[in-house]
Amino acid sequence: EGATIILGFAGVGLIGPIIGNTIIEQIDDLKEIGFVASDMLPPISTFYDGKLKHPFRLYYSPNYNLILGISEVPFQISSAYNDLAKTICNWALSDDVKAKEIVVFQGIPQKGMINEFPVYYASEDSQIKQFEEDGIEKVEKGIIVGPEATIINEALTNKLKPLALFTPVYQIPTPEGAASIIEV
């Protein structure tokens, strides 16, 4: 009850999976609790250190009351994200989970060299004060696209507090941007 759900999707800069896999390495009691299976996922499997894994996995840490979802591949049909968002948010609000917030990440594509990787946020009013105290800048306006957008829209419709964290990224995997978000 009261868990935070962190979802890392494979988007620009791959910061979602990079952040998710880094969290797995850093939190000792984070254990795989399940996976998401869908005909809308491309025919891809993943493996780490020779161990096969589902491309969309769920983990839980009792010490941090944290649920982590990592999708290392995009869905084949973008309209499937709406169903995914409804399923995740309904599960998050179920009596088994009763989550309080959902956190997503999105890279801001940049051209050329990126010298700094500042972190920006977009959230509901109740979270703004904490970010201001921590010195994290808000995004004044913009759009969020992809699975992160459908998750946020569904969370806003329900009783979940959505939070989006952004950082500049290259069009290729950008671990520097992911590291900036992890520090927050």
Model-based region annotation:
Residues 1-98, 157:
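N-terminal catalytic or cofactor-binding beta/alpha core of small enzyme domains
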Residues 7-9, 69-70, 104-106, 166-168:
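Short beta-strand segments
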Residues 9-15, 75, 106-112, 170-173:
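Gly/Ser/Thr-rich loops at beta-strand to alpha-helix junctions
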Residues 30-31, 100-101, 138, 162:
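Residue-level detector of short coil/turn "hinge" positions at structural boundaries
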Residues 54, 109-184:
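Catalytic cores of processing enzymes, dominated by hydrolases/peptidases
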Residues 76-128:
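Internal, conserved structured core segments that host functional sites
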